[in-house]
Amino acid sequence: MPMKGRFPIRRTLQYLGRGDVVFKESVKIMTVNYNTYGELGEGARKFVFFNIPQIQYKNPWVQIMMFKNMTPSPFLRFYLDSGEQVLVDVETKSNKEIMEHIKKILGKKEETLREEELEKQQRFHPGNFGPRKYCLRECMCEVEGQVPCPGLVPLPKEMTGKYKAALKAST
């Protein structure tokens, strides 16, 4: 993607990954109501411009809807899976204050994020085998230096059970 347009750094993976708000699984929809004019909504405009892309990147399951120039004062509304709605007033707040506030009320705790990261690292540990969805390797034969699968390359005669049984029977 070319680095053109207004503030193109917002579209880089490094910038998107730096967002620190990861919502709880109960958050399903987020609506942002703001105005494109006026001093009171400056923080909301900056929040939409700089922080919404990070939130979208970190929370792909959350639907985000923007409503411009439809309200006298800017606010955020979150719809939870229980049917509950959380209303956040963002008038006179800066975009950083808005981020801290929504992280505090609807974001996952730091301990939870660390536990999930540790679990993810354990799941993709190179010593684990299983379906590609969960592990790096499906079979032990994919490890270099190991005996290949008998279905792909026939085993040496000395390693087969039939040969060992015949050898025991003959002695």
Curated annotation (Swiss-Prot):
The keyword 4Fe-4S does not apply. Keywords: Mitochondrion, Ribonucleoprotein, Ribosomal protein. SUPFAM superfamilies: Thioredoxin-like. GO terms for biological process: mitochondrial translation. It is found in: Mitochondrion. Pfam families: L51_S25_CI-B8. GO terms for cellular component: mitochondrial inner membrane; mitochondrial small ribosomal subunit; mitochondrion. One of its GO terms (molecular function) is structural constituent of ribosome. Belongs to the mitochondrion-specific ribosomal protein mS25 family. Component of the mitochondrial ribosome small subunit (28S) which comprises a 12S rRNA and about 30 distinct proteins. This is Small ribosomal subunit protein mS25.
